[in-house]
Amino acid sequence: MIYGIGIDLIEIGRIKTLMERQKKLPERILSKDELTKFESFSHEQRRAEFLAGRFACKEAFSKALGTGLGKHVSFQDINCQNDELGRPYIRYEGFKVHVSITHTENYAASQVILEKM
């Protein structure tokens, strides 16, 4: 049974600006595994795209959960990884999580569907 659906869209330029102003931004948003992948990218544009995509994914997840980010779930509670084919996934107890992340030159977007197990 579908529990919730969330979607988020963010400007990559906004994330780039925040990255310049707040050097610890990636550490605040990304899990340890995500941060390792982020740091493997050598180009700042790719880093911004990745961070924007993960930010959108986590926002979409929190919207699907119905709580938003804050008291009940934080950025660090949501760990979005990629499987061997590159598909994003999130494991969250009690739910099957369907994740989609996309990028254009200027935007990153994500949709998350939660199924109650």
Swiss-Prot record:
EC class of the enzyme, as a word: transferase
One Gene Ontology term, aspect cellular component: cytoplasm
Keyword Nucleotide-binding: no
Subcellular location field: Cytoplasm
Catalytic activity: apo-[ACP] + CoA = holo-[ACP] + adenosine 3',5'-bisphosphate + H(+)
Protein task: Transfers the 4'-phosphopantetheine moiety from coenzyme A to a Ser of acyl-carrier-protein.
Name by which UniProt lists this protein: Holo-[acyl-carrier-protein] synthase
